[in-house]
Amino acid sequence: MKFSQNMLSGLHGIIPGGISIRDFIAITKINASDSREILDVFVKNGIGSKHEDKYYFEESDKLKAVIELLKSGGPLDEISVALHWKDFEGLVAEILHSKNFAIIKNLIMTKPRMEIDVVGIRLGVAILIDCKHWRRYSSSTLSSAVKKQIERTKQYVAKTNGAIAAPVIVTLYQDKIDFIDRVPIVPIFQFSSFVDDFYGNLDQIRTVTT
């Protein structure tokens, strides 16, 4: 899926539910023939589906389109403007759900107040995910994010009887899986395979237990 200004504008037309060509034109200000072409390209790349004269999108489809445009070399700073943090969290949760995890989104803990973006639980282990959704992060910024996520994980375990939990950071833009203090830093496009291998690699990943 090649990057272009029209494809960038088309991201704004990826709205959960059904959308007609006319709706898409009104939102994106792209002409009719280009709008149809863009929507068909989305569907061809597994983003949304077409039934009769309408195109149907899921909550996570906008982020899927963003990832495809980034892979084709599109500029992160321009593309990320079209992305909402809920799109990012939605895809993370969808991937976990597709792999039979129980999901909690935006879990609020009190005393002290902390929020965990996405929790996935399976086979007695919880993955606690902090989503860093758009910009490139320096190593010092990521280190700080890791420390905060470890603290959230400790709080979660302290409030959950018998819990085993692993803190994880998921980023939009990163070349490969990395580790800081044994906490995985996972690019979203590798998150699915990371989850597949998670239990086999658990001995290499930081976990917190009661």
In which residue ranges do the predicted regions lie?
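Nuclease-adjacent, charged terminal/linker segments that flank catalytic cores
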Residues: 1-79
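Non-catalytic C-terminal interaction segments of nucleic acid-processing enzymes
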Residues: 1-16, 166, 174-210
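N-terminal positioning helix adjacent to the helix-turn-helix/winged-helix DNA-binding module
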Residues: 3-7, 88, 114
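Acidic-basic catalytic patches of nuclease active cores, encompassing PD-(D/E)XK
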Residues: 64, 68-107, 210
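Short, well-structured alpha-helical interface segments that form or flank functional binding sites
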Residues: 87, 91, 113, 144
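Active-site metal-binding core of divalent-cation-utilizing nuclease and nuclease-like domains
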Residues: 98-124
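Catalytic cores of nucleic-acid endonucleases
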Residues: 126, 131-189
